[in-house]
């Protein structure tokens, strides 16, 4: 008897067997409605089989309306993801079909594309870049200084693919970036792109998915999960700010959206374009070995000068109490404001202060569920853990020694810088942009609109503000703590610091007026600053590659982390040690177990085992065999992170 194996979008499910009614003609990839437990679900026809007896099997009910189906390329992507990231097929299918689209009737989202586009003239350098991209048959990086017009280049590519009737995906690391790109897109192409992110409602998702499956949606701008959308006719994949760590998913299925999007584009035979002013080490290495192609833009659009970068030695600054802005920076801000120019102050730390402690007994306020300090939030009068979200009141006395008036706060957060700026410049309009102050795309769009219309004089921001924004009247950037993050033990600490400082500095001087960037540092001789000041990313990349090579770390090797967690620390450590003891002999290096940098998270103690192997070694096959040798108790949660980006 002929049956269909149906892949349902549900965690930990493999394809299930269903009888095929004689009246129903099915093909691989068809979307069908099947009974599952007490309800009906939409599933994907995965494969067919013949069995001798099928009396206990349930029957496929029907195809979904409009005979919608998943392409063979998307099916290949599901298989690849499951194999590479060692995840269940059902979990991957849920990324492709995050909601049930079988309900009817439902309006289909359709974009009306008019091929008479209004595209601005390109510079000679940009025209050469477009020519190279048109001739390229491999993933291509557009590497250009901040403000060089990388977006306009891929807009010209989009125009070509729209004329061909193809679908286009533009990926951004955070959808907060989308506001300015959406406005520019509408101005250029005359219709609104579809936005795909976590804020899209269930009803909107159904409409969008139907539109994509029926090829009526042509352009999508989205965050990580947009790469799984079931495009029928994908022609171009753009991965903007390709270096950004936000492309790595750190919960659920631990995948890298940039890398997966490149695989997706390869399966679909789509052109793949990566963009960044500060590309990742991995991408630069792939260019070096000929796997990717490079297009370089050395000039800003309209030949606008790059900003000057000045380093302020904070060891020589005499700051007044509760002050974090140097006299040099304060004077520069005054001059800038007097000239009717805008200022950006950058500190990658949310809240008012990162730590509260008792001066009498030394007690530090830490999260009861995590191994992290509680951050002081003066605006909400709360202490908050930025890892699990736990909150408590701000105490008036020490809960440890019970002394009064002994509590003090240490270090600045973004709210503290706002307080200082308002005291120094009371007549000026000051705004803050961070995850606490701009919790939805609408609020972010409002702040950006105010900035563009010169309704804000000083914008104070976290990492959110470093990515791709264009403010022509902004000529001064002040980095409050340029040392933050550069001195930790993370493999990628130097890379992240260089990228962050280069990107935030690139917000200055993009219109009229020379830009200047001030980096406040207690370690002014840090070699990273010399690379940033000189704008010499090539030397930085070369130096970083040498360090990675000598340490046998990516991109010269492949790595995986096994993360074990649970509420009983000693038992979790015991299981981790047992795993290492029975590890199969192979040409791999095993480090650990060691406590994670975040040793306790949401009440669970965490230990890591790091596996380092040769680039050609089948790490997934090795891990599967290793895990088959040990039974993990139910109280221990095990995760595998292929190609880990961090070790928190």
From Swiss-Prot:
Subunit structure: Component of the replication restart primosome.
GO biological process: DNA recombination; DNA replication initiation; DNA replication, synthesis of primer; double-strand break repair
Binding residues for ATP: 144-151
Sites where the protein binds Zn(2+) 1: 358, 361, 398, 401
Name of the gene encoding the protein in the UniProt record: priA
Keywords, comma-separated and alphabetical: ATP-binding, DNA replication, DNA-binding, Helicase, Hydrolase, Isomerase, Metal-binding, Nucleotide-binding, Primosome, Zinc
GO molecular function, one term: zinc ion binding
Stretches assigned to the Helicase ATP-binding domain: 131-297
Entry EC number(s): 5.6.2.4
Cofactor(s) for this UniProt protein: Zn(2+)
SMART domains registered for this protein in UniProt: DEXDc (SM00487), HELICc (SM00490)
PROSITE patterns: HELICASE_ATP_BIND_1 (PS51192), HELICASE_CTER (PS51194)
Short motif (DEAH box): ranges: 240-243
InterPro entries assigned to the protein according to its UniProt record, in alphabetical order: DEAD/DEAH_box_helicase_dom, Helicase_ATP-bd, Helicase_C-like, P-loop_NTPase, PriA, PriA_3primeBD, PriA_3primeBD_sf, PriA_C
Name of this protein: Replication restart protein PriA
Catalysis performed (reactions): Couples ATP hydrolysis with the unwinding of duplex DNA by translocating in the 3'-5' direction; ATP + H2O = ADP + phosphate + H(+)
Coiled-coil intervals, chain numbering: none
Superkingdom, natural source: Bacteria
Record-listed Zn(2+) 2 binding positions: 367, 370, 385, 388
An example Gene Ontology CC term for this record: primosome complex
Cofactor note (record): Binds 2 zinc ions per subunit.
Functional note: Initiates the restart of stalled replication forks, which reloads the replicative helicase on sites other than the origin of replication. Recognizes and binds to abandoned replication forks and remodels them to uncover a helicase loading site. Promotes assembly of the primosome at these replication forks.
């Amino acid at each position: 008897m002929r049956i269909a194996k149906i892949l349902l979008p549900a965690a930990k499910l493999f394809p299930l067997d269903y009888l095929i009614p004689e009246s129903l003609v099915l093909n691989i990839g068809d979307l069908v409605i099947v009974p599952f437990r007490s309800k009906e679900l939409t599933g994907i026809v995965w494969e067919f089989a013949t069995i001798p007896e099928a009396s206990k099997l349930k029957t496929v009910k029907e195809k979904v309306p409009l005979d919608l189906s998943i392409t063979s390329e998307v099916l290949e992507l599901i298989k690849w993801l499951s194999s590479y990231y060692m995840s269940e097929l059902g979990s991957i299918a849920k990324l492709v079909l995050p909601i049930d689209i079988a309900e009817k009737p439902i309006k289909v989202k359709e974009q009306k594309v008019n091929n008479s586009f209004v595209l601005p003239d390109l510079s000679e350098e940009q025209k050469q870049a477009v020519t190279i991209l048109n001739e390229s048959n491999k993933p291509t990086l557009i590497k250009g200084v901040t403000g060089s017009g990388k977006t306009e280049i891929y807009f010209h590519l989009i125009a070509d693919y729209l004329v061909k009737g193809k679908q286009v995906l533009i990926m951004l690391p955070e959808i907060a970036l989308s506001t300015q790109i959406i406005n520019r897109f509408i101005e250029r192409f005359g219709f609104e792109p579809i936005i795909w992110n976590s804020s899209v409602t269930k009803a909107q998702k159904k409409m969008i998915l139907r539109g994509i499956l029926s090829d009526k949606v042509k352009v999508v701008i989205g965050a990580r999960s947009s790469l799984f959308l079931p495009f029928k006719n994908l022609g171009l994949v753009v991965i903007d700010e390709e270096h950004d760590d936000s492309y790595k998913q750190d919960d659920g299925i631990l995948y890298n959206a940039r890398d997966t999007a490149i695989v997706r584009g390869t399966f679909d035979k789509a052109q793949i374009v990566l963009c960044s002013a500060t590309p990742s080490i991995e991408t630069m290495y792939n260019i070096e070995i000929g796997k990717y192609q490079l297009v370089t833009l050395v000039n800003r659009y309209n030949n606008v000068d790059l900003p000057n970068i000045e380093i302020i030695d904070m060891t020589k600054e005499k700051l007044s109490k509760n002050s974090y802005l140097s006299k040099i920076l304060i004077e520069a801000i005054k001059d800038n404001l007097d000239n009717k120019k805008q200022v950006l102050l950058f500190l990658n730390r949310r809240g008012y202060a990162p730590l509260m402690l008792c001066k009498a007994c030394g007690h530090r306020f830490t999260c009861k569920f995590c191994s992290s300090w509680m951050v002081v939030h003066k605006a909400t009068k709360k202490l908050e853990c930025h890892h699990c979200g736990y909150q408590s009141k701000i105490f008036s006395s020490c809960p440890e020694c019970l002394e009064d008036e002994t509590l003090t706060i240490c270090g600045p957060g973004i709210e503290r810088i706002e307080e200082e700026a308002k005291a120094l410049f009371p007549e000026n309009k000051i705004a803050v942009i961070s995850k606490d102050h701009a919790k939805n795309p609408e609020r972010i769009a409002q702040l950006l609109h105010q900035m563009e219309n010169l309704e804000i004089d000083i914008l104070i921001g976290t990492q959110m503000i470093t990515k791709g924004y264009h403010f022509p009247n902004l000529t001064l950037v002040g980095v409050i703590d340029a040392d933050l993050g550069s001195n930790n033990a993370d493999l990628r600490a130097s890379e992240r610091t260089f990228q962050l400082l280069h990107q935030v500095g690139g917000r200055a001087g993009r219109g009229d007026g020379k830009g200047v960037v001030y980096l406040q540092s207690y370690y002014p001789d840090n070699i990273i600053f010399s690379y940033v000041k000189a704008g010499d990313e090539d030397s930085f990349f070369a130096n970083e590659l040498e360090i990675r090579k000598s340490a046998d770390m990516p991109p010269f090797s492949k790595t995986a982390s096994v993360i074990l967690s649970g509420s009983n620390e000693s038992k979790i450590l015991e299981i981790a040690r047992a795993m290492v003891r029975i590890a199969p002999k192979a040409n791999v290096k095993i480090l650990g177990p060691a406590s994670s940098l975040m040793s306790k998270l949401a009440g669970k103690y965490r230990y890591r085992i790091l596996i380092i192997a040769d680039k050609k070694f089948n790490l997934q096959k090795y891990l599967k065999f290793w895990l088959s040798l040990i039974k993990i108790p139910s109280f221990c949660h095990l995760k595998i992170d292929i190609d880990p980006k961090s070790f928190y």
